[in-house]
Amino acid sequence: MAPSTPLLTVRGSEGLYMVNGPPHFTESTVLPRESGRNCKVYTFSKDGTLFAWSNGEKVNIINVANKGLLHSFDLPKAVCLEFSPNNTVLATWQPYTTSKDGTAGTPNLQLYDMKTGACLKSFIQKKMQNWCPSWSDDEIICARNVNNEVHFFENNNFNTIANKLHLQKVNDFNLSPGTQPYKVAVYVPGSKGAPSFVRLYQYPNFAGPQAALANKSFFKADKVTMLWNKKATAVLVIASTEVDKTGASYYGEQTLHYIATNGESAVVQLPKNGPIYDVVWNSSSTEFCAVYGFMPAKATVFNLKCDPVFDFGTGPRNAAFYSPHGHILVLAGFGNLRGQMEVWDVKNYKLISKPVASDSTYFAWCPDGEHILTATCAPRLRVNNGYKIWHYTGSLLHKYDVPSNGELWQVSWQPFLDGIFPAKTIKYQAVPSEVPSEEPKVATAYRPPALRNKPVTNSKLHEEEPPQNMKPHPGSDKPLSKTALKNQRKHEAKKAAKQEARSDAAPTPVPQSAPRNTVTQSASGDPEVDKKIKNLKKKLKAIEQLKEQAAAGKQLEKNQLEKIQKETALLQELEDLELGV
């Protein structure tokens, strides 16, 4: 029988230990405290029944229910651990090393049988990135990326490769959640003028030009993040470039793409320019939330047609977290932001609370869907380390501060399978707490002596937008429907066009002091130059259409790709002509 709340595991300079969840927060006897700084890594199994950790000498595995030691492996350098979904296999990874004479190193990725303790297979895995094999939820298939192709194993038989997915230089892949039919998303970066692409396949149908379930191509991508929804019906792809050629952002440029297993794909249109900070699926698999745009960032919920469902307006935020049941959404600003959180009821789109977890670097929902963990961990921040447990209504239930000379490296909840904790009715009143709530200190702006005796003017650097259903609509208490909003915009556009036509028909007289060589936007005065400008604009429009076709997945001809490569030169030529250079 599951405990009332999951355990908390804490790893830091004080050692490795477990804490009972709310309401007690006492140290648990499940794991005797491992003192010292030698613990490098720990992990729970997916259902929370097994716990493994490395203490710098051995990797130990215990049964959480009876506290019994199951296995102990002599792996002093292990820094990564992960259980397979059904607790059949433990994967361990150690840094890859070669001998001094230059001979190849020994295999550093081990797969252990949890029943017998025997090593099923060892592989050489040089990179820590994507080190762990990916299993389907029923463990029927398991996949690894080996030398730019994906190898598939069946029924945990790692001595025989059951299938291979070979494309030109597969950079990354993502196995779908759930059981049969199994699907896999693969990413191939672009090269030699060809676009990057993400393709979806159904295992084991990889052969032939029509084998892919869906395909999405894009030019602006140095790396991608692929996110399956829970029902494995669609993937969200965040495509990122390392450098933003427009100079708008230091952190490169991001675009968000939607790809469904039925072949549909789309570019998700984000109303505000700027970085994409976070994208998360709701557990219902019918909608997703994106946090994006230059600060203050916007947050919007989209449906499967990529249409916006609800706009949360703007605010100091860079992360989004749905509760395990999908009925609550937390929008937060962590890292270099102050730690403000907004807790929303996403069924009614109603704000529940706005707690502040200052200096937080970590956030996690408790599997019960009621409690929240925030923490300040090293090495991200080496001062004021500690963790806090909140109720989603905004009450701070527990707080632990690490001593000033100590550090907190990791803290997390014990996981549980879906359905163990039923969804409860949402409360809006803050639950009682014995921990006093911390009022964040508001930093006052510097005021020069001459202004100190005068009233403070309330001015903001940015005007924050309210959520969509809070925007005032004249003559109506309810927000306008999508159709009504569209008609209103059309009417406003017509009105603006009429006013523009009138102003063109009756231009205002130019003052005598105005310079005579002012160039109008429509003409340069030289018919030959105007003709060149018109032709250049025509070519640029054709290039834009080709780019849209490529983004939609169409295979372009060689001469069409060459046209796209000429875009920069054409833009420069157009700019020179318009400036009269």
Swiss-Prot record:
Q: Which residues does the annotated region (Disordered) include? A: 432-533
**Polar residues biased stretches:** 514-524
Task: Provide the positions where the record notes the PTM Phosphothreonine.
Answer: 5
- List cellular component terms (GO): cytoplasm; eukaryotic translation initiation factor 2 complex
Q: Which residues carry this modification: N-acetylalanine?
A: 2
Query: Which Gene Ontology BP terms does the record give?
Result: endoplasmic reticulum unfolded protein response; negative regulation of translation; positive regulation of ERAD pathway; positive regulation of signal transduction; regulation of translation; response to amino acid starvation; ribosome assembly; SREBP signaling pathway
Coiled coil: which residue ranges?
Answer: 527-578
Q: Which UniProt keywords apply?
A: Acetylation, Coiled coil, Initiation factor, Phosphoprotein, Protein biosynthesis, Repeat, Translation regulation, WD repeat
What are the WD repeat spans here? Answer: 23-63, 125-163, 356-401
SUPFAM superfamilies the record matches: WD40 repeat-like (SSF50978)
Q: Which PANTHER family does the UniProt entry name for this protein? A: EUKARYOTIC TRANSLATION INITIATION FACTOR 2A
Q: What is this protein called?
A: Eukaryotic translation initiation factor 2A
The gene coding this protein: Eif2a
